Structures are given as C-alpha cells and as structure tokens.
C-alpha cells in the first residue's frame, strides 16, 4: 500500500511562496544583479543586451513578460531589471488590482523609466486590463471624472515606464495583453549542476558549512527549482545543527531529506499521493484530471500548476488526449509490476529485461 498519511502538513518542496518570515529569508538569498544570476543563460544574455541598449538610448526598457512554473526566479528577474536600469520598482499582483482606480493610482505615481511589476498578471480583471492597454502602448490612461450625464473622460499622460508581468499560466493571458509585451521569456527548470551552485552560494550567505557532495544531494532533490533548493537547504541546516556537527555532507543531507519525506527522486508525500492514486485506483491511467483531483482531494488547478509540471518534465507523468498516464519508471519506483495491456506495444518494451 502506498503511504498517504501526513498529507496535510505544509510541503517543504512546494515552490509556492512561504510565510512572511520564510519570504524575508528568501529575499535575502536572491541575486541582485544579472552577473550574480545563475541559470536561464539565454534569457540572461537577452536581458543584458536589451537593458544595455535601452540605457544607451536613455529610454525605458520595453515591457517584459516572464512565464513558467513557480519558484524559478520571475520575481527575482523583475527586481534585477530595475536594479540594472537604475530605477525604482513598484510591485503588486493581479488579484490586488480589483478596480481601474487601483491601477491608475499606481501608474500616475511612477517616475520616468520606473519598473512596475505585476505578479499573477493573468488574474487581472477585464476592467483593469482595458485601462492597461493605452498605458502600455501610448503611456496614457483615460479616467472618468464625475457621474451621470456630467461625467467626462480625461486623458492623462504617463512617464515612460516598463511593465514586467509574471505568470505561471501564460495561456490564460488575453491575446491583446500578450501582444503588448516586447520581450517574452519562458523560464525553464534548472539543472542539478546549476542548483548545486545556488545551494553553495546560499549556504555561504547563511554562514553554513557545506561540501560539494552535500550541495549536490540537496540540488538533485529540489525539483529543478531554486526556491525549493533554498528551502531544503535551510531545513537540512537545522538537521545538521541538531543531529550532526553543523556541517552539511551528503550523508547528513540524505538523512535530513528522508526525514522530510523527500525521496531520491525529489518526490514528497503529495507527489506520491497523486502517483499512487493513478497506479492503485486507475491502473496507471489514462485518467481524467477531474477524476484524479477528486481521488486525491485536491483542486484541478493545484494538480496542473503545482504537482504536474515537474512530474511531466521528468517523464514520470504524461498528458495524452485520453487523460494522464503514469510512466513505467514510476511503477518501478513504487515497486510495482508494469501492467501488460492488450494491444499496448509499450508493455512489451518496458517488460523486456
């Protein structure tokens, strides 16, 4: 039987933003400049060129859209863009901007070339989005003054600014909004080598002794995500200080991560609950998203946005027109025999010695 207890505990390998105290620590570990930024080499190279060109012309950088799974550095890049441009950054999120006046207040307080960062930009309301279009294109907004028959529209000029939008669901952006971004970048999962470097850098900032093997052990279980790598590092640090001599080695990291229920594939209890339900209740699939969500008691959005991206990227899970299918490697990971299905050629392939 696949274990599914203790599933209500917070996920230590979740890439979602942590509580306020954890968020303060995460901000302290963020790189401040492109030269310090590790990974996403192509995006980093592009931004270096675009930023330098904008500075040479004494112009605001073109609007930037960053998308990809959570925890890969979209917010960090927004702060870096502002720092490299030498301007202020104003930060908000799509759900916070409920009314057109909320956005108008932000825009009218911007200084020339400032960066406005909107996280979860796909969640902007249609009313707010309509106000944003002329602001992005013409650096102007239309506001209504008065009510009833006496109401009139007034056009306000805005200073040139850069909008940096971040989203985990680029497909939910409307075409008119997406088309107004001059720079569009997708952030990819990090390699274990890149994450090991990030873990080593963060350990130095936290004044924690760690060897290369310990950094690699944490990195390979961090699901390709820097936010998770830094979170695991802090928990392994706690374990090392209490259960060991304070230094993080590979055996110490392994023991700490197993205590946290993070296995050698980087899967935690939530992942194993999802995959276990697919294997035990649906024979490995195909299974529809709604059925899977009902089986494990999670929302479809949580499965799509939080659980699936890494599992699909690693080949543990497949999306097909008929539904989700668990890969042969996951059957093996759970110690179960891969089923032979009639007419399934892959069963012959995976059952071969």
Curated annotation (Swiss-Prot):
Head domain (RuvB-H), as annotated region: 264-353
Enzyme Commission number, as recorded: 3.6.4.-
UniProt keyword annotations, A-Z: ATP-binding, Cytoplasm, DNA damage, DNA recombination, DNA repair, DNA-binding, Hydrolase, Nucleotide-binding
Main subcellular location of this protein, as a coarse class: cytoplasm
Sequence segments annotated as region (Large ATPase domain (RuvB-L)): 4-190
Family, per entry: Belongs to the RuvB family.
Protein's UniProt name: Holliday junction branch migration complex subunit RuvB
């Amino acid at each position: 039987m696949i274990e599914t207890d203790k599933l209500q505990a917070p996920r230590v390998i979740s890439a979602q933003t942590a509580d306020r105290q954890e968020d303060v620590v995460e901000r302290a570990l963020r790189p401040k400049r492109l030269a310090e930024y590790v990974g996403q080499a192509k995006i980093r190279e592009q931004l270096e060129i675009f930023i330098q060109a904008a500075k040479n012309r004494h112009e605001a950088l073109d609007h930037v859209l960053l998308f990809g799974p959570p925890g890969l550095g979209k917010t960090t890049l927004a702060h870096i863009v502002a720092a490299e441009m030498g301007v202020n950054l104003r930060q908000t999120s799509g759900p916070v901007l409920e009314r057109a006046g909320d956005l108008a207040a932000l825009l009218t307080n911007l200084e020339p070339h400032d960066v406005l960062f909107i996280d979860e930009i796909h969640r902007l309301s249609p009313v707010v989005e309509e106000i944003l279009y002329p602001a992005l294109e013409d650096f102007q907004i239309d506001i209504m003054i008065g009510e009833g028959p006496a109401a009139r529209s007034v056009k306000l000029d805005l200073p040139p600014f850069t909008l940096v939008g971040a989203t985990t669901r680029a497909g939910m952006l409307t075409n008119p909004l997406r088309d107004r971004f001059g720079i569009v970048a997708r952030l990819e999962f990090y390699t274990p080598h890149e994450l090991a470097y990030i873990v080593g850098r963060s350990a130095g900032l936290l004044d924690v002794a760690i060897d290369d093997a310990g950094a690699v052990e944490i990195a390979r279980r961090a699901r390709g995500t820097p936010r998770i790598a830094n979170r695991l590092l802090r928990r392994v640090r706690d374990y090392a200080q209490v259960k060991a001599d304070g230094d993080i080695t590979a055996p110490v990291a392994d023991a700490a991560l197993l205590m946290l229920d993070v296995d050698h594939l980087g899967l935690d209890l939530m992942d194993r609950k999802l995959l276990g339900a697919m294997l035990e209740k649906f024979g490995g699939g195909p299974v529809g998203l709604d059925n899977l969500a009902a089986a494990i008691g999670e929302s479809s959005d949580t499965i799509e946005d939080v659980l699936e991206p890494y599992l699909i990227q690693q080949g543990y899970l497949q999306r097909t027109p008929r539904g989700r299918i668990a890969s042969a490697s996951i059957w093996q990971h759970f110690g179960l025999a891969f089923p032979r299905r009639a007419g399934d050629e892959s069963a012959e392939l995976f059952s071969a010695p």
